[in-house]
Amino acid sequence: MAANFWESSHCTEWLLDRNKIEESNPKDKQYLTPIELKKLRTHYCFVIQNLGNALKLRQRAISTAIVYFKRFYLKNSFVDCEPRLVAVTCLYLSSKVEECITQAKKCAAKMKEIDHSFNYLMNDILECEFFVLEELDFCLIIYHPYKSLPFYLQSSGLDPASIEIIWGIVNDSYRTDVCLLYPPFVVGLGCILLGSYLLKKDIKQWLSELNVEMKDIWEVSKDLIDYYEFEKQQSLQNQSELDLLYNKLPIRNKK
């Protein structure tokens, strides 16, 4: 494990450019429009979040699982690798990495409660885990904004109510691609910038004293605004509509 972010595989191997992300899910694009594919990608972030909540896992483990899922589908497509199974497997794997271990059998049973059409069992998850590990190149340590955020929030002078909203924005950020594009401290600052704007809090002086590159921080805020607009316009949790999109894909080995 690297002693700090800048020496880690997260920094040296898994910070990507937008073109790399846009090239992902190539086979799925034969069956879904870009908007439909974006809806499904976002939906599985909700799936992981909801399953993690049901299993009472820490938010950090849930966020790590979402990053695993996003990284996995940079190399793979939904049609080749069943996304519900991969989502559950990523969460099971992250629970071990983040030291809040749950059982594969429990993951399968709880997912079945959430999605009655989920027919995968413990052995399917354990088998899938080896494939996920290979596709992640065994790079399992994920750095999150959660570590640097308390320091920035304390020094910003924002009130407790504003801070709580910003924590929510950070969790929402995992439904975007900013975790693949920017270092975690940049993501955290982008969330603070957006939160202060929405709450009409002036933090310009504080930001100027941080001596950080503002371009990427603005980009993170813009990506989050785009996501919230997308969420307003699309039925991201309309299960019947999402089922229709899922069924448009000729997924191999679907149970």
UniProtKB/Swiss-Prot annotation:
Molecular function GO labels: cyclin-dependent protein serine/threonine kinase regulator activity
Localization per Swiss-Prot or TrEMBL: Nucleus
GO cellular component: mediator complex; nucleus
Alphabetized InterPro entries for the sequence: Cyclin-like_dom, Cyclin-like_sf, Cyclin/Ssn8, Cyclin_N
One of the GO BP terms on file: regulation of aggregation involved in sorocarp development
Domain (Cyclin N-terminal): residue spans on this chain: 46-134
CDD domains named among the record's database cross-references: CYCLIN_CCNC_rpt1 (cd20513), CYCLIN_CCNC_rpt2 (cd20514)
One Pfam family per UniProt: Cyclin_N
Keywords, in A-Z order: Activator, Cyclin, Nucleus, Repressor, Transcription, Transcription regulation
Keyword hit for Repressor: yes
Origin superkingdom: Eukaryota
Free-text function comment from the UniProt entry: Component of the Mediator complex, a coactivator involved in regulated gene transcription of nearly all RNA polymerase II-dependent genes. Mediator functions as a bridge to convey information from gene-specific regulatory proteins to the basal RNA polymerase II transcription machinery. Mediator is recruited to promoters by direct interactions with regulatory proteins and serves as a scaffold for the assembly of a functional preinitiation complex with RNA polymerase II and the general transcription factors.
Assembly and binders: Component of the Mediator complex.
Family, as annotated: Belongs to the cyclin family. Cyclin C subfamily.
The protein, known as: Cyclin-C
Organism of provenance: Dictyostelium discoideum (Social amoeba)
